[in-house]
Amino acid sequence: MPRLSPPIETGLLWTLLALPGAFMTYRYVQGTTFYGEYLHATGELGARLLIVTMAVTPLRMMFGNAAWTRWLLGRRRYLGVAAFGYALLHAAAYLQRQSFAVIVEDAGELALATGWVALLVMLALAATSNDISVRQLGRRWKWLHRTVYLAAVLTFAHWILTAFDPLPGAVHLAVLAALEAIRVWKAAGLNREVRSS
């Protein structure tokens, strides 16, 4: 089976990542989807894409240099930017719905503040998810992109604190924590092998 050229493959991937958001937004604008449903759906999809983005390294450690893990690694930036895009739709719906006074008042509450800080961190990550930023920032780029862990903790804190039922958010957080535990465990094993060799 012939492989797609990189531009076509990238375009198809972006289309697949954007389609759910376009469909949800269309239904929301048409009034078919209610505000609460749209807010939940965009936030949940953004959080799930964030998990997939962060799962790439643990999966490579678990399954090695398989073709599908290499494919994921090469598209990790796209997944991260898409996660930010859905977080932005989530925030835009809230801003469109609430008055300025309510927005200012809510921003001081932990449940909402965690979401805003997570969005700002994800904005910085999305804005620097390109080769130009990698070259310009040098070692600082890797340091900056480690703040994805902060964004993840804040994202799931926001989900758990604002949800009527915190269990789904807690389950997603547990999945991410398990993947990160595997990453740390595998990395520690590799370090021991290096020291003993």
What is the meaning of each model-derived region?
Residues M1-S197:
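Membrane-embedded alpha-helical bundles that constitute the cytochrome b-like, heme-associated redox core
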